[in-house]
């Protein structure tokens, strides 16, 4: 099996932990796995991207643009930012609840993620998760990455 999975979000959402769990599960199933993270601003709220390449053919742990089979996005704007990594007929799993960047919090530009979700629906096959509602049911924001991994399964 060859599969390229890109996870993206912002610092503090559990993106890296989710990628490590996927990689670990794939290795336990006997697959060769390459993974890497690119973490922007190295702080809560900075952009985080995790690359997971499952299969023998991967020469690099970084997924080239146009090669990802699945994009798992913990934040709508990060999903749009990382769309160029997807190949045709890929799937996007995205949390519809936005994390407002500092600039939005200061300027109140009205960012609520709805325009990003509408754009994503036009560009890819999407599974939209209402993060806010799911977290209320789960009772803890700390388990959201597990909810997203359930959607991947």
Q: What name fits each language-model region?
A:
Residues 1-153:
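Active-site cofactor/cluster-binding pocket
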